[in-house]
Amino acid sequence: MDEGFILSNKYRRVIFDGLASGETNIDRIAKKHRIIPHVAHKIAEEFINGGVLEKKENKYVLTEEGKKLSAKISE
């Protein structure tokens, strides 16, 4: 997955930025940014399938690839 995929959609960008800032709860990110929870979870699944995110217990955590993308996007 590349940064263009994340940046091409405003909801993906918001959720990715929330996860990159250390938040581990998708529902909390969705509520904060007024995103429909179902949409937020669908985006999280896209990130998991793309290898950027992993789910540990009930928390979502960026993978090493996700951390590299975060650094690249924030430049």
Predicted stretch roles:
Residues 1, 74-75:
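Short intrinsically disordered terminal tails
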Residues 1-15:
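Short alpha-helical segments that sit at the start of domains
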Residues 7-8, 35, 62:
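Alpha-helical hairpin
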Residues 20-25:
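Short capping segments at the starts of secondary-structure elements
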Residues 48-58:
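A short, conserved structural fragment
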Residues 59-73:
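Basic, amphipathic "hinge/linker" alpha-helix immediately C-terminal to the N-terminal HTH DNA-binding motif
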